[in-house]
């Protein structure tokens, strides 16, 4: 069992969701070399007064409205270029964790890496992780959710099948979005990060790569989002018994918090990979 979540956890996040503007496309650029048989675009989504969200949108050519499943993938920690995904009979989004152009120059990404170096981690003299409103992951998750809201409004979606996936930081994002969007039918996550934040204060193994515990970070615990998952969402988890970044104690707390249909595969000696 994880540390107790804040009493107003759901209220906090529901209030953030309620402030999101419509997920309108501010800019759409066609990908020059998508996979054969697919259309692909870079999309920039409106976040109102906050920085926009960016994602790759792909779907099979000549698809008719209302006929496609939907899939969303989120990515691991870092400030790196991402790639589109191509899934049969599916309209898909590959979502950038940051408000960052997807077709920038090498110099642009170098600058972004310097700007976002150590994001999410409290630095000396920095109060970011002392205030739940200022935690870097707040706007990250809201951008992630806006991408999900976009695909749920996409006319190509069949309105039924929505699979959300991710690994490590991407698993944290995927779990949060599945919890907040309420319409995910499948959640597939591997080596999920930020589970049982502060568990080390109760004697559990500490992560070797996780922000130091603060009460504000309790609002960003993957376990608490997992407890909010819709009971119609089928959850599959893969994790490693040798993972010191996402210790198995935290992943087990995540599994135990889920009230939906679920399965977990722990692999002996698997580390954070």
Task: Tell me the role of every PLM-derived stretch.
Residues 145-208:
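Primarily recognizes the serine-hydrolase "nucleophile elbow" in alpha/beta-hydrolase
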Residues 47, 73-78, 97, 240:
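Glycine-rich His-Gly loop
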Residues 82-87, 91-142, 199-201:
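Cap/lid segment of the alpha/beta-hydrolase catalytic domain
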Residues 73, 94, 187-190:
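A short, hydrophobic beta-strand element of the alpha/beta-hydrolase
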Residues 198-258:
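The feature captures the conserved acid-bearing segment of alpha/beta-hydrolase catalytic domains
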Residues 1-39:
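N-terminal targeting or regulatory segments adjacent to alpha/beta-hydrolase or S9 domains
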Residues 54-59, 66-78:
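Short beta-strand element of the alpha/beta-hydrolase
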Residues 261-273:
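Histidine-bearing beta->alpha loop at or near hydrolase active sites
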């Amino acid at each position: 069992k994880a540390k107790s979540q804040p009493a107003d956890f759901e209220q906090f996040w529901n209030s953030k969701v309620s402030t999101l503007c419509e997920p309108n496309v501010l800019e759409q650029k066609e990908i020059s070399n998508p996979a054969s048989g697919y259309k692909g675009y870079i999309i920039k989504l409106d976040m109102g007064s906050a920085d926009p969200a960016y994602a790759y949108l792909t779907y099979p050519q000549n698809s008719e409205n209302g006929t496609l499943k939907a899939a969303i993938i989120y990515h691991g920690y870092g400030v790196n270029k991402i790639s589109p995904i191509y899934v049969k009979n599916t309209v898909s989004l590959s979502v950038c964790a940051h408000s960052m152009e997807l077709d920038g120059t090498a110099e642009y990404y170098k600058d972004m890496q310097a700007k976002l170096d150590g994001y999410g981690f409290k630095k000396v003299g920095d109060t970011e992780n002392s205030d739940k409103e200022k935690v870097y992951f707040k706007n990250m998750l809201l951008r992630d959710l806006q991408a999900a809201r976009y695909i749920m409004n996409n006319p190509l979606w069949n309105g039924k099948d929505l699979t959300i996936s991710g690994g490590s930081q991407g698993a944290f994002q995927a779990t949060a979005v599945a919890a907040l969007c309420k319409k995910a039918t499948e959640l597939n996550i591997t080596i999920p990060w930020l589970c049982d934040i502060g568990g080390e204060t109760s004697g559990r193994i500490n992560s070797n790569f996780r922000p130091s515990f603060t009460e504000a970070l309790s609002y960003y615990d993957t376990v608490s989002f997992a407890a909010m998952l819709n009971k119609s969402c089928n959850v599959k988890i893969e994790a490693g018994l040798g993972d010191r970044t996402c210790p198995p104690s935290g992943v087990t707390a995540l599994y135990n918090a889920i009230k939906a249909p679920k399965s977990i595969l722990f692999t002996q000696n698997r580390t954070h990979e």
